[in-house]
């Protein structure tokens, strides 16, 4: 019946055009009439097996629902005001109020959308007739549907139904974005939040995320008689159970990697530790080393081994091979015992503790320091504190994708305003920390179309196990945030922008970046969605000394972890960070490949003296355990 109905609506003689019509169509592959034989992969062949598998999939879905509901019934999970859904509803209601409050405004917006829909519908009807309309006129230009990996399957354009859905989706997404941008009377933060939430909704409602509206999913479901859904719903239940009531999105095969076995392999020793960190010294691989040791302060929002994923990608190993004596702070994965550990504690018991350890192990008081992301923000604040205290141990500082000014801090600012922060602080007070899954989801939401929905479709609708990928393993190996530390960071940096306003109080002292006179290598990545290059650029001008501002290709991770042997990307140098970022970048000099050798040369320019290679701990400190240590092994 289904096949006959299709043939009545779309007779083959109307859908298959002759060669003259085809040659008269638009260039660049404008399609001829639709061939009904293309529907064969979409026709159900074994309804009985499909029905049985559908029942099995529903059974697995019920198990997923039970895994989600059970901890809530036991009171182990309570929905709180920090749920993004709560703020999203409040924010988008303001957009809705603006457009509904004026009938003329409402009518104009609806007319624009309906006009776009009508154009798409007319084109779809004409495509049913062939490459030209019923009167022989050329088809109207196809709306801009842009390149999008979600719609790479050829049937998104070849099949009129899916082509129609695709075009409607893009037109509707653009229309909703325009509603936000043209809403008057909203403050900048609220409009930013509204735009962000609209992108989340449109990403979630993409036709690529549903079986009935995704040609590839539909064909695979028909071809396997629904076996993909049985597997997918089983994995969904497993992942909700693994997350103890929250979905732990399956992005990679977590069983294929282990820290210390497959990653974080650079030889070294843990030579000191306290409540919040371990200090690792790596074994030398050269006969001589630079006199000044190198201290790396990584972020605590993720784990340090992003800089030591494997020997081929390891920044740490590369530094060791260049003759650097490398020390790394490995932060604890905090729990309730660390609730009161604030920024001052991380500065004193982290960076200062590491500097004291380095002096004991090497006898050196002068150090080169590197800070990555929030680790760089802490390093910058600690440098300002040291300047206030006349502490001159750190002689140069390198900042990877580090924000010190948060004026242009990007989409993470969506999650920080007084109302949301107060709710978050109340939530953290109960346990003493913020669970790592909350931060992980926030980061994934920044690129939902790349980091959430493709994996949702692949795992739970296609029923495919994800491929092993070391970077995604690291991304999923999230950490908790100590309550006092996280609250200080969000309130003083994202909310108040206190560090560049000379309003930050650290360990009882008001600090200023203008007091930081040492040379700084400030690295931004061009496509960074966490620490935008424009934000890093602006931050460069608040230091009191010379800043070498460098921009590298790619994003927050790939731009930093870019070994020279890969011959990927490029970097730009162009003198002081003055004027506008866009102008600076246009005038900067581009160099192909990795920025690592450029940075190494910068380090040696400031002190290239060498001494005999050192052993971990020297004569003063005994090894506690092998690198990468036990703190990094603690899973959330």
From Swiss-Prot:
NCBIfam families from the UniProt entry: PHA_synth_I
GO molecular function terms listed in the Swiss-Prot or TrEMBL record: acyltransferase activity
UniProt-listed InterPro entries: AB_hydrolase_fold, PHA/PHB_synthase, PHA_synth_I, PhaC_N
Primary subcellular site in the record, as a coarse category: cytoplasm
Function: Polymerizes D(-)-3-hydroxybutyryl-CoA to create PHB which consists of thousands of hydroxybutyrate molecules linked end to end. PHB serves as an intracellular energy reserve material when cells grow under conditions of nutrient limitation.
Stretches assigned to coiled coil: none
Name of this chain's protein: Poly(3-hydroxyalkanoate) polymerase subunit PhaC
EC number(s) reported in the record: 2.3.1.-
Localization (cell): Cytoplasm
Any one biological process term the GO annotation gives: poly-hydroxybutyrate biosynthetic process
Pathway: Biopolymer metabolism; poly-(R)-3-hydroxybutanoate biosynthesis
Family assignment from sequence similarity: Belongs to the PHA/PHB synthase family. Type I PhaC subfamily.
Reactions the enzyme catalyzes: (3R)-3-hydroxybutanoyl-CoA + [(3R)-hydroxybutanoate](n) = [(3R)-hydroxybutanoate](n+1) + CoA
A Pfam short name: PhaC_N
Stretch list, region Disordered: 1-38, 129-152
Gene Ontology CC, one term: cytoplasm
Keywords: Acyltransferase, Cytoplasm, PHB biosynthesis, Transferase
Leading EC class: transferase
Species this protein is from: Rhizobium etli (strain ATCC 51251 / DSM 11541 / JCM 21823 / NBRC 15573 / CFN 42)
Residues annotated as catalytic: 373
Sequence ranges of Basic and acidic residues compositional bias: 143-152
